[in-house]
Amino acid sequence: MDALFHLRDMIASLDVPLTDDLCARARLPRNDDLYALNGAAAPAPEELAGAYAGSTTLAGRVLLLRPFYVRAVLPALCAPGGGAAERNACIAADTACLNSLARRLALSIHVATRKREALPDALQTALGTGDPARVENAITNLSVEAGVLARVEARARKNGADADTVRRLAVLYADVLIPLSRKIQVHGLLAEA
């Protein structure tokens, strides 16, 4: 499991720029006029996880994440509003967030590989069923996730984020980003099974 701990350290190091970028974006309004998705809904997390795990380039992953980012991340992070004055700042902040998010989620694929190599009994049993929910339950480590949330909150406070932004970031991680990361891992594990 040493390789898995090393990957968790790498993820922690990627949470720093992601948290910094999300804090910077949270200071700006959502500015919905910037996002032409042509009515495209955000993909379901399972669908996004499969497509994401199958993509091999940062640019391809950013393209896959964009509808999810616009439909799930921005509303959870930013207040509505905005206009021409913030346009360039919003675009730059969105680009930074998408790149940081794509890098952070890319390590989920490697975490799945390491978990598969370690193959604890609970994971082996879950993989044998082929049930994504059981596999997700087997790989979930609540103490690790609590550590991620504490780290994100501390980094957000260090960035000078107000209490509401710290709370929104923690909720975004807990309800959106960590579950998506798990689903990417599940997809990778079941694809290899």
Briefly describe each language-model feature range.
Residues 1-193:
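Extended amphipathic alpha-helical regions
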